[in-house]
């Protein structure tokens, strides 16, 4: 008979308790991922038209997204410090508040300056949110199971896009901006709700790995980031295409709501399948075909007057982009030192790459669209993405599980 004093009983209960905490935290992370990205996608697809209505041209609409991304990038290097001071629950809740509250002020903003100011505040929240999501999720699972965990996290992100992006366009075309902004604030509230799945305190969600974290020096940072360079470059290029597609397809194609819905839907399935393939075969074997499919789908954005071709391209873009996100994130995490500090640093680097690419695409795409139209913008973006495969890859991660 096992009594409560039996060490085996205490150990078993500890394992059950730890598993319940992990499930609770992962569930909270998925709720937060859905809410945060639903809010993000609603406004990403609606605000360009709102900015144009306020007197800005395509370049002004692109600059609005670029402001959001610039603010996001500015806060991300400080997120490990923030997580250590506030803890996971409070950090995630803060990100939801910063992401959602400015949305309520958007109906009163009618100038590009005011819109950029609110976008900057939202960018602070988004920057904290995206680093928290991928870092906290990764910390919950050992390296061998991260592909599927990241796949599920990415699926939640994709479902948010399936609902958020087309709905934002549809509401903008009805000029139902007040409803759009209220929905963006409400879905951001789910980030705050999801934060309660995490325990109080500042400790990592799982014990630190066997490697001790390097001190944060310029030399140490470069050494830790150097093995990640290849996946990070691919991430920047792929999200540049993402910024172009999701900012400018709504301005160039009448079938934009259907196209973005198709892209987001295919991305959900691709993230789940890619997670399984990555755990089985390694991220590098998934990455190359995923990049090529993304480039092909991006080029199809030039078919603004051919709905069938545009929709087919959108399906390809979503499938390729979803797989690229899962593969690059897993590869970056594999290149990091195990432990909370190393994984946190990798999470920051990957998210900076994501947001930098999105900002580059939305900012540079406006002048290119004005100069050459869709036939110049989308194929040029696709060619730049595909050309990156010609760049020699960096050395393999020190503790990669490739080639299983």
Map each language-model feature to its residues:
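Helix-breaking motifs and short loop linkers at transmembrane-helix boundaries and internal kinks
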Residues: 87, 108-113, 282, 304-305
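Structural signature of the two symmetry-related core transmembrane helices
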Residues: 90-104, 185, 285-299
């Amino acid at each position: 008979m096992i009594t409560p004093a039996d060490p085996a009983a205490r150990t078993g209960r500890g394992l059950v308790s730890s598993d319940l905490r992990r499930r609770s935290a992962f569930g909270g992370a998925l709720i937060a991922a859905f809410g945060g990205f639903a809010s993000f996608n609603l406004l990403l697809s609606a605000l360009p038209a709102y900015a144009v209505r306020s007197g800005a041209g395509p370049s002004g609409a692109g600059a609005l997204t670029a402001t959001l991304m610039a603010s996001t990038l500015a806060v991300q290097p400080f997120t490990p410090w923030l997580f250590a001071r506030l803890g996971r629950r409070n950090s995630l809740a803060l990100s939801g508040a910063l992401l959602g509250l400015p949305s309520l002020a958007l109906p009163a903003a009618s100038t590009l300056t005011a819109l950029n100011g609110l976008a900057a505040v939202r960018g602070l929240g988004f920057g904290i949110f995206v680093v928290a999501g991928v870092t906290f999720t990764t910390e919950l699972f050992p390296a061998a199971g991260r592909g599927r965990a990241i796949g599920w996290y990415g699926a939640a992100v994709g479902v948010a896009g399936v609902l958020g992006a087309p709905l934002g366009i549809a509401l903008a075309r009805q000029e139902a901006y007040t409803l759009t902004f209220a929905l963006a604030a409400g879905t951001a509230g789910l980030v705050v709700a999801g934060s309660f799945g995490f325990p109080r305190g500042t400790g990592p969600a799982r014990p630190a790995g066997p490697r001790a974290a390097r001190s944060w020096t310029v030399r140490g940072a470069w050494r830790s980031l150097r093995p990640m360079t290849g996946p990070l470059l691919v991430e920047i290029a792929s999200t540049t295409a993402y910024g172009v597609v999701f900012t400018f397809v709504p301005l160039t194609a009448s079938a934009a709501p259907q196209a973005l819905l198709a892209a987001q839907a295919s991305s959900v399935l691709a993230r789940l399948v890619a997670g399984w393939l990555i755990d089985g075969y390694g991220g590098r074997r998934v990455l190359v075909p995923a990049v090529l499919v993304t480039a092909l789908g991006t080029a199809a954005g030039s078919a603004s007057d051919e709905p069938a071709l545009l929709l087919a391209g959108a399906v390809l873009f979503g499938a390729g982009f979803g797989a690229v996100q899962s593969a690059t994130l897993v590869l970056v995490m594999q290149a990091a030192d195990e432990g909370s500090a190393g994984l946190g640093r990798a999470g920051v680097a990957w998210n900076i790459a994501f947001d930098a690419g999105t900002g580059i695409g939305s900012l540079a795409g406006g002048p290119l669209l004005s100069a050459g139209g869709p036939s110049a913008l989308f194929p040029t973006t696709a060619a730049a993405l595909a050309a990156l495969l010609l760049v020699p890859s960096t050395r393999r991660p020190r503790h990669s599980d490739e080639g299983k």
